[in-house]
């Protein structure tokens, strides 16, 4: 099958043998596509190598043969954002999450849009945490895993003053009592859930609980295997960077 003049974001690229790259691309029309880019080394291939870097938006032509498509041509459409520090790790995170969750050869246009919006947010220099929570919400919605952010699992309106535990299947379950500090760490305020549903920035003190709760839901859909980017972000936090 010929994939011609397709747009896609490069999620990951790694060396294969001496002169080639294995590249994962998130496309509009074909979902996540694995590309084999042969002969990318040498001075004449510098532009091609630059185009096949994570976060880069490219247009490419490839021939699908089995699991991998043979890359025939690729060029950068724009300039990928130059990210540093935590923003760079956040870029690694959004790419890794879709590398794990986006289905192969199954178009989910919403995921392409999610990635484009998150990439633009990182490039803008805006606050990272809120942009990442929006990204996670939209990815879950795009994959059909989203949940009601206005009502709890019993169908009752979410109370901004209450606390909830996010269940990957049932959504927000109201917590009636918190006996231990750990119980509180594993819950999120109703106010934060309502804000997420209404696309409003939650209160600063509610953001850590929202992050932990969303991570728990994502971990379920990742079959219990965490992300390397999570480990890197946690190590950065421990070092006080």
UniProtKB/Swiss-Prot annotation:
GO terms for biological process: DNA recombination; double-strand break repair. Transmembrane segments: none annotated. SUPFAM superfamilies: ArfGap/RecO-like zinc finger, Nucleic acid-binding proteins. Keywords: DNA damage, DNA recombination, DNA repair. GO terms for cellular component: bacterial nucleoid. It comes from the Bacteria. It holds the Pfam family RecO_N. Belongs to the RecO family. Involved in DNA repair and RecF pathway recombination. PANTHER family: DNA REPAIR PROTEIN RECO. This is DNA repair protein RecO. The gene is recO.
């Amino acid at each position: 099958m010929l994939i011609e003049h397709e747009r896609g974001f490069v999620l990951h690229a790694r060396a294969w043998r001496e002169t080639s790259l294995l590249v994962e691309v998130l496309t509009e029309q074909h979902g996540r596509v694995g590309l084999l880019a042969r002969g990318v080394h040498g001075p004449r291939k510098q532009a091609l190598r630059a185009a096949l870097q994570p976060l880069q938006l490219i247009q490419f032509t490839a021939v699908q043969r089995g699991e991998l498509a043979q890359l025939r041509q690729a060029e950068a459409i724009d300039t990928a954002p130059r990210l540093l520090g935590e923003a760079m790790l956040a870029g690694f995170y959004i790419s890794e999450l879709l590398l794990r969750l986006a289905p192969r050869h199954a178009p989910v246009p919403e995921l392409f849009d999610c990635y484009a919006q998150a990439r633009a947010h990182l490039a803008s220099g805006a606050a990272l945490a809120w942009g990442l929570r929006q990204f996670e919400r939209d990815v879950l919605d795009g994959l059909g895993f989203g949940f009601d952010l206005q009502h709890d699992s019993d169908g009752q309106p979410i109370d901004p003053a209450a606390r909830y535990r996010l269940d990957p299947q049932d959504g927000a379950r109201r917590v009636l009592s918190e006996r231990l500090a750990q119980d509180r760490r594993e819950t999120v305020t109703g106010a934060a859930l309502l804000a997420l549903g209404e696309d409003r920035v939650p209160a600063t003190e509610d953001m850590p609980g929202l992050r932990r709760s969303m991570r728990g839901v994502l971990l379920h859909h990742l079959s219990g295997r965490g992300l390397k980017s999570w480990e890197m972000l946690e190590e950065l936090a421990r070092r006080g960077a």
